[in-house]
UniProtKB/Swiss-Prot annotation:
Family indicated by similarity: Belongs to the SELO family.
Keyword Thylakoid set for record: no
Record's keyword terms, sorted: ATP-binding, Magnesium, Manganese, Metal-binding, Nucleotide-binding, Nucleotidyltransferase, Transferase
Protein's UniProt keywords contain Transferase: yes
Disulfide bond annotation, renumbered to this chain: none
Essential cofactor(s): Mg(2+); Mn(2+)
Active site residues according to the UniProt entry: 250 (proton acceptor)
Underlying gene: ydiU
Binding site residues for Mg(2+): 251, 260
Annotated ATP binding sites: 88, 90-91, 111, 123-124, 174, 181, 260
Species for this entry: Rhodopseudomonas palustris (strain ATCC BAA-98 / CGA009)
Name this protein carries in UniProt: Protein nucleotidyltransferase YdiU
Catalytic function, reaction form: L-seryl-[protein] + ATP = 3-O-(5'-adenylyl)-L-seryl-[protein] + diphosphate; L-threonyl-[protein] + ATP = 3-O-(5'-adenylyl)-L-threonyl-[protein] + diphosphate; L-tyrosyl-[protein] + ATP = O-(5'-adenylyl)-L-tyrosyl-[protein] + diphosphate; L-histidyl-[protein] + UTP = N(tele)-(5'-uridylyl)-L-histidyl-[protein] + diphosphate
Length: 492
């Protein structure tokens, strides 16, 4: 029986300069590592069929579903501030789109499926390590409630890829609301192709912002919609210590999802200057720089839309600048509301922002673990007089000791009872995140020993990040000094 993919493809209806038609390059011996069965069901796919050898053939790119329209998408992008007029899918091939059980259109893409016209000097392949990292982190982000691309499957290819060191090859099946990036708009704008910019904007409105079509200025509504989603997204990143690592405009999703996990990492000890990515030598994409970089990326999008916002360039620029001016307010509102909730502040008082920021200052001064400090504060919410477990996380607790009495006094003014407050705090302060040293251990077991049991276990743990279980206690702990991962790599 043939695995059925109910593709309903819309992107291929756009002009041919938007993509290149390309077939995946076959692999030697595909072997399914993991299928995301709940996601498969949500997409209207048959997980039992996908777990057969035929399913592995499809998920590796060896066989194409009948209704697939496999393409590599064209886009440009600013990489670390430098504009590259042509990038495109160099190792990813979009099989097609399905409408899921919630009526949402989703892309299904094979990452590591072989060379495309956009591959430049690359081999079009993916190594096992980065595939496992993206699978783990994207699914963890989904469980944390943060908009993200998803991972449907991971498949070994039976081949090796030339990396340093040589690694087993793998293919990731990625699912996204779309793969339209800021860089997609830049690709056409850089060529002076206003007709294609307009066609892309119309497509993005129809797919992601249908309400914008009824607005007095649909293209302004599109820009404002993307600004709002990015503000909310990056605020959510900040709440879990997530560092994307490579916030280039080609990695900025117009749909407002986290995309392209590459050298991403989660911060252990709180420090706004934290950088893990080996290619971010000057800290452009450090944890604390992510909000202004998001605005920088959105400004590049606005530049592409100026001629759609008004016939006169000066007027279009003025309209765009006004829209961009709303980012800071939207980000700050989302950020401060989320941060207050993490501290158990569910009503608003004038000094809440200062109290919240002072806790972050105490974390930095005390070199405390970001995730664990908030979680232990949640645990202490029932009896705020005993903050011993929180205090023990601080190498230097002086700033925390100064802050703690003010927090106790503030939460005493909250209307809910202590048990309700604790439950609410635990719903926003995860016990488990994909800690870098845990991911590295999973990758080493898989790459070095062909052992995927640790991979399965970490997925189980991270599927319920807010539910603490004694048997998973080690996953909540920060790394020991010898376990610390100080640098992450893109893997391309």
């Amino acid at each position: 029986m043939t695995a059925h993919f109910p593709f309903d493809n819309s992107y291929v209806a756009l002009p041919p300069n938007f993509f290149a038609r390309v077939a995946p390059t076959p692999v030697a011996a595909p072997r399914l590592i993991k299928l995301n069965r709940p996601l498969a069901v949500q997409l209207g796919l048959d997980p039992d069929l996908l777990e057969t050898p035929e399913g592995a053939e499809i998920l590796s790119g060896n066989q194409m579903p009948e209704t697939a329209a496999s393409i590599a998408m064209a886009y440009a992008g600013h990489q670390f501030g430098n504009f590259v007029p042509q990038l495109g899918d160099g190792r990813a091939i979009l099989l097609g789109e399905v409408v899921d059980r919630n009526g949402v259109r989703r892309d299904i893409q094979l990452k590591g499926a072989g060379r495309t016209p956009f591959s430049r000097m690359g081999d079009g392949r993916a190594a096992l390590g980065p595939v496992l990292r993206e699978y783990i982190v994207s699914e963890a982000m989904a469980a944390l409630g943060i908009p993200t691309t998803r991972s449907l499957a991971a498949v070994l290819t039976g081949e090796t890829v030339l990396r340093d060191p040589i690694q087993p090859g793998a293919v990731l099946t990625r699912v996204a609301s779309s793969h339209i990036r800021v860089g997609t708009f830049q690709y056409f704008a850089a060529r002076g192709d206003l007709a294609s910019v307009r066609a892309l904007a119309d497509h993005a409105i129809a797919r992601h912002y249908p309400e914008a079509a009824q607005a007095p200025s649909p293209y302004l509504a599109l820009l404002e919609g993307v600004i709002g989603r990015q503000a909310e997204l990056v605020a959510s990143w900040m709440m879990v210590g997530f560092i994307h690592g490579v916030m280039n405009t080609d990695n900025c999703s117009v749909a407002g999802e986290t995309i392209d996990y590459g050298p991403c990492a989660f911060m252990d000890t709180f420090d706004p200057k934290t950088v893990y990515s080996s290619i971010d030598q000057f800290g452009r994409y450090a944890y604390g720089n992510q909000p202004p970089i998001a605005l920088w990326n959105l400004t590049r999008l606005a530049e592409c839309l100026v001629r759609l916002l008004a016939d006169d360039d000066d007027k279009g620029i003025e309209i765009a600048q006004t829209a961009l001016g709303g980012f800071a307010e939207q980000f700050n509102a989302a950020y401060l509301a989320k941060l207050a909730a993490k501290l158990g502040l569910f009503t608003s008082q004038p000094d809440d922002q200062q109290l919240s920021q002072e806790f972050l200052t105490a974390l930095a001064k005390g070199e405390a673990d970001f995730t664990l400090a908030f979680r232990r504060l949640s645990d202490a919410a029932v009896d705020p007089s005993d903050l011993g477990e929180v205090r023990a996380l601080f190498a230097d607790p002086a700033a925390f000791d100064e802050w703690a009495p003010r927090w106790r006094a503030r939460i005493a003014t909250e209307p809910q009872d202590a048990t309700t407050r604790q439950a609410a705090m635990r719903r926003v302060n995860p016990a488990y995140i994909p800690r870098n040293h845990r991911i590295e251990a999973v990758i080493r077991a898989a790459v070095d020993r062909d052992d995927f049991a640790p991979f399965e276990e970490i997925l189980t743990v991270l599927a319920n990040p807010f539910e603490e279980k004694a048997e998973f206690a080690r996953y909540a702990e920060p790394p020991q000094p010898h376990e610390q991962v100080l640098e992450t790599f893109c893997g391309t």
